[in-house]
């Protein structure tokens, strides 16, 4: 399923709007705390393992959003937005939310 941050898809006509769809995922407390601890340990470098966890969280949120759109009969999602927020009592978890508008585009 096509998902794009733009409000339209060049060369395609939107034939039906189904409404807003979302997908969410949360990275657990220990992982999130360890993520920030690793940042302190890295000077001028990148932590590939934590980047991979964040990438997986983003991909999960996008997949859930697309699955919700498919259940409505959509074949694309436009206006996609990704948000990252800390949640929990001490802000020890990270929530990734994907949202957009489910649409049907001409084939």
Curated annotation (Swiss-Prot):
Organism domain of life: Bacteria
Family membership noted in the UniProt record: Belongs to the UPF0145 family.
NCBIfam families: PRK02877.1 (NF002776)
Name of the protein: UPF0145 protein BVU_2335
Annotated organism of origin: Phocaeicola vulgatus (strain ATCC 8482 / DSM 1447 / JCM 5826 / CCUG 4940 / NBRC 14291 / NCTC 11154)
